[in-house]
């Protein structure tokens, strides 16, 4: 039996958590399973199956990933990485690592995909420092928190939002995107 497994799952529905259960089943006791999932699996919509998973396995970490992570694959699903320790019940007295890693230093280049804008190595180093606990905890970026099996496992449930960084321009941009989405939806442009 393997001690480590990493998988990418970008489908819809609760089949993702069933897949995670299968992956963890095949790992040795204490083996580490790392999976990229839609954020809904870590949020409220995945509560029942996730709670069942945590009766048998430990959630070590959950990190929200950049919005355009799978841009090259034409998949628009918001994702997170979840890290599990197999066959060891989740201990509600131990902390789980949560991070909002939405900027990986890559930029979307039309017709070229995501490309490193020169910041990836520094960002990777920062993320490693956060994971191993050598970086100062920042409640707006990452933290460690004790959670129950019935709690959300999504970083956004626990990490604070710094509203001081929002501008009127940000608000206008979101409204314009939403207006365009509504128009395209009403015109049937988004269907099939």
Q: What positions do the PLM features span?
A:
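A conserved structural/catalytic subdomain of Rossmann-like adenosyl-cofactor enzymes
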Residues: 1-192
């Amino acid at each position: 039996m393997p001690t480590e497994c990493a998988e990418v799952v970008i489908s819809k529905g609760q089949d993702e958590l069933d897949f995670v259960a299968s992956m963890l089943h095949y790992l040795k006791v204490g083996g580490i399973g790392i999976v990229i999932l839609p954020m809904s699996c870590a949020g409220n919509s995945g509560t029942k199956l996730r709670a069942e998973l945590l009766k048998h396995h430990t959630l070590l970490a959950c990190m929200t990933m950049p919005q355009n992570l799978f841009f090259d694959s034409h998949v628009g699903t918001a994702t997170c990485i979840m890290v599990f320790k197999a066959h060891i019940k989740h201990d509600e007295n131990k902390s789980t690592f949560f991070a909002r890693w939405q900027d990986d230093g890559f930029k979307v280049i039309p017709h070229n995909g995501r490309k490193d804008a020169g910041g990836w190595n520094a960002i990777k180093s920062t993320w490693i420092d956060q994971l191993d606990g050598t970086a100062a905890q920042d409640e707006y970026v990452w933290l460690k928190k004790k959670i129950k099996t019935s709690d959300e496992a999504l970083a956004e449930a626990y990490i604070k939002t710094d509203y001081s960084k929002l501008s009127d321009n940000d608000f206008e941009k979101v409204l314009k995107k939403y207006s365009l989405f509504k128009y395209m939806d009403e015109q049937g442009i988004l269907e099939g």
